[in-house]
């Protein structure tokens, strides 16, 4: 594995606010992608009381080559999860929350109804909190993402993750064009919802392939793109091809804005929910 360049060195997670956030998460039996996916930004985010909550359990039914989340046979759904989530958000006094999940291909709806219940419970308990969801593709199960779009989260994020050529290696159980279709249909079903998608770089993709993904996302009317460095979690995961320089990320940001995205986040440490509240405010200002 490559040694990390200086620009990817994040501060170790410490501090009183960090520990308070951790305690609230544990008290309400919540999982976070910050912990499960070993996010490098956990220290910065949790010290701001920003946490990305992961619903539907902590075990994924897929084994994507880039992801550090545990895979296997998941537990049954927790019926108290939506209420526990809403209470934790209120206790953390979050103005903006990001909710993601593992893939649950074992469920008839892929877990879509649990997303909807979480949205409804948050609006009941802490109505001022804006809601951003980051969903899987639900294995193209009929009516799944459509029902969530109708529930009207403020932001609907679904990550494209990588370029089409690398899907068989990186996301073998997903389909590039289904992800584009999902994003396009969410916008058609509920035009007031902001749509968002993320792309990892450093897996062997070319600049031309990245620009094509940008064009495809704009054709699907996606408002916001995030571009970040792939970091290989363990030696068994997809091999890192290279570290993309900060200057290249700035170049991609410039190009993405020129293609019509309302907001672009592009840097080595950019992740889907990194600075999500600030970026949501930027999105609102663009409308």
From Swiss-Prot:
Molecular function, one GO term: 4 iron, 4 sulfur cluster binding
The keyword Cytoplasm appears for this protein: yes
Cofactor: [4Fe-4S] cluster
Binding-site list for [4Fe-4S] cluster 1: 34, 39, 45, 273
Residue ranges occupied by any Radical SAM core domain in the UniProt entry: 46-262
Residues binding [4Fe-4S] cluster 2: 60, 64, 67
Entry's Gene Ontology cellular component terms: cytoplasm
InterPro entries cross-referenced by the UniProt entry: Aldolase_TIM (IPR013785), Elp3/MiaA/NifB-like_rSAM (IPR006638), LIAS_N (IPR031691), Lipoyl_synth (IPR003698), rSAM (IPR007197)
Keywords, in A-Z order: 4Fe-4S, Cytoplasm, Iron, Iron-sulfur, Metal-binding, S-adenosyl-L-methionine, Transferase
Cofactor note: Binds 2 [4Fe-4S] clusters per subunit. One cluster is coordinated with 3 cysteines and an exchangeable S-adenosyl-L-methionine.
Keyword Transit peptide: no
Enzyme Commission number, as recorded: 2.8.1.8
Pathway annotation: Protein modification; protein lipoylation via endogenous pathway; protein N(6)-(lipoyl)lysine from octanoyl-[acyl-carrier-protein]: step 2/2
Entry's localization field: Cytoplasm
Catalytic reactions on record: [[Fe-S] cluster scaffold protein carrying a second [4Fe-4S](2+) cluster] + N(6)-octanoyl-L-lysyl-[protein] + 2 oxidized [2Fe-2S]-[ferredoxin] + 2 S-adenosyl-L-methionine + 4 H(+) = [[Fe-S] cluster scaffold protein] + N(6)-[(R)-dihydrolipoyl]-L-lysyl-[protein] + 4 Fe(3+) + 2 hydrogen sulfide + 2 5'-deoxyadenosine + 2 L-methionine + 2 reduced [2Fe-2S]-[ferredoxin]
Family: Belongs to the radical SAM superfamily. Lipoyl synthase family.
HAMAP family: Lipoyl_synth
PANTHER family: LIPOYL SYNTHASE, LIPOYL SYNTHASE, MITOCHONDRIAL
Protein name, entry field: Lipoyl synthase
Organism: Wolbachia pipientis wMel
Encoding gene (name): lipA
